[in-house]
Regions:
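N-terminal secretory signal peptides that target proteins for export/translocation
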Residues: 1-11
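Cleavable N-terminal signal peptides
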Residues: 18, 28-29
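Alpha-helical protein-protein interaction scaffolds
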Residues: 31-142
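Outer-membrane beta-barrel strand-turn architecture
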Residues: 83, 117, 192-200, 231, ...
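Outer-membrane pore/translocation modules
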Residues: 124-129, 133, 143-149, 158-170, ...
Length: 474
């Protein structure tokens, strides 16, 4: 019984050895059979017949065993490009171009892959490596003075007056109270981009904001209403460096000038004393001195961002220092943009920022998702969570400098891409805001004059904006 068992084991072991030898020999034979010549012949056949998936399987297998050539990279890149997998096409086109044998067609496909993948800065580098004739076909109006131009215009409205315009501001003591009603705003933005050097882009933008505000002052149940405008002029400047492929370093600055003339009140102790002795009328104007005050502010933001493309991932880090509404702020954030389908038709962007003001830090988180609806129409949704006040995003381009705190910002954008280098967009954004109101309560008397204790209360309202925008790439 033991002899039979031993023979069976020997035969089993011998069979395994023979099978392993056959596998090794077949693999060696296959490697000998797969040469540059037959890979070139096979991929050329697939290339000419538009059999892109078969070409990818054969080409990637050839790369795995160490076969490398310009034609293989060019054909693989083209196969991924035709299947709209632009992120997979990019490294093959880059490798083909790096050999020095690439023609204009390969560079054009690399340029278009960068554009479709959202890598504008890398695309600009490739654009200026092409011949002037091919460059003019892609960008007919390309020039050294202006690379792109944009214009946005919009209007905002709120329910602040509806919700809070009739509040009893002076409290139970009818002492004193005030608030500012934000009724909306009108704004427009003009931007241009220059490309003096293919790896160095400069962006400029001017933004005008006209806010419709109302100051309410209340004393002894009498309310004074003062309608006024706050006008802001904003200048933004950004530099984008591409020191090496896929890496972008971008410092920026944003200057904000605001002007307004608003009524202010100061307690008039003489008038109040006369009132106590029977002089004067029971009016706010006899207890407080009202005066129009011109207010001018100069604010700024200095920002820096660094990002790096790694396949379908674009991680980044950003930081800023700012002076807004009389206080200093600092921010540091981490972000990542992902194309989960390896094509540009779905992207997800996440950004987490630590914002510090007056030694108080809070976390602000932004989530964005964009997808293609039809061939040229795109839809983006976005939301920002946190205590948003004196805050900036997009490397200082977008500023939240309203004195009222935004608790939630959300919205959507429709973007249409025309075939002649123009993009149009329609944007809706909404904000849930919280503002502060002042109420003075009498806590006692000194020398026949009241002693006030100032109290701060809060009120909420919604703020909505609609904007239209156009951008043209020359």
């Amino acid at each position: 019984m033991s002899v039979n068992t031993g023979r069976i084991f020997q035969r089993y072991l011998c069979g395994i050895v023979i099978l392993v030898l056959l596998l090794i020999s077949s693999k060696v034979f296959a490697q000998k059979e797969i040469t540059i010549e037959n890979v070139d012949s096979l991929t050329l056949e697939y290339f000419d017949n538009g059999q892109w998936k078969k070409l990818i399987r054969a080409g990637e297998k050839a790369l795995d065993i160490g076969i490398e050539s310009y034609l293989l990279r060019m054909r693989l890149g083209t196969a991924y490009f035709e299947l709209e997998n632009y992120f997979d096409a990019i490294p093959h086109f880059e490798k083909a171009v790096s050999t020095g044998y690439s023609d204009g067609v390969v560079k054009q496909k690399l340029y278009e892959s960068y554009i479709y993948a959202g890598r504008e800065e890398d695309a600009n580098v490739v654009l200026y490596e092409m011949t002037e004739n091919r460059r003019s076909k892609l960008r007919p109006l390309v020039n050294n003075f202006i690379n792109d131009a944009s214009f946005d215009i919009g209007s905002s409205f709120s329910n602040d007056h509806t919700n809070n315009g009739s509040l009893d501001l002076d409290g139970q003591d009818n002492a004193y109270g005030e608030q500012t009603i934000n009724r909306g705003q009108f704004f427009f933005d003009v931007g241009i981009g220059q490309l003096p050097i293919r790896w160095f882009k400069i962006n400029y933008a001017f933004t005008y904001v006209n806010r419709d505000l109302q100051k309410q002052i209340m004393f002894n149940n009498e309310k004074i209403l003062d309608d006024y405008k706050q006008k802001q002029g904003r200048l933004f400047n950004e530099f984008r460096f591409v020191p090496v492929n896929s890496l972008m370093i971008s410092p920026s600055g944003h200057y904000i000038n605001s002007e307004e003339t608003v009524i202010g009140a100061s307690f008039d102790s003489v008038s109040y004393a006369n009132k106590l002795h029977g002089f004067g009328k029971d009016s706010i104007r006899y207890y407080y001195t009202l005066k129009d005050t011109a207010i001018k502010k100069d604010d700024f933001i200095l920002s820096l961002s660094v990002s790096k493309w790694i396949s379908v991932f674009n991680p980044g880090i950003s930081g800023s220092f700012s002076y807004l509404n009389g206080t200093h702020q600092s921010q540091i954030g981490l972000s990542i943009k992902v194309y989960p389908l390896s094509n540009p038709y779905l992207s997800i962007f996440s950004n987490a920022v630590i914002h510090n003001q007056n030694s108080v830090s809070n976390l602000i988180f932004t989530q964005t998702a964009e997808g293609r609806i039809t061939e040229n129409l795109w839809l983006e949704g976005f939301a920002t969570f946190g205590k948003i006040s004196n805050y900036n995003e997009q490397n200082g381009r977008i500023v939240y400098n309203d004195p009222d705190m935004t608790k939630l910002s959300y919205g959507a954008m429709l973007r249409y891409v025309f075939p002649f280098n123009m993009t149009a967009k329609l944007i809706y954004s909404g904000q849930s805001r919280e503002k502060k109101m002042i109420t003075d309560a009498i806590s006692g008397y000194q020398n026949n004059l009241p002693v006030y204790t100032r109290q701060t209360t809060t009120a909420e309202y919604n703020f909505n904006s609609i904007a239209l925008g156009l951008k043209y790439d020359f």
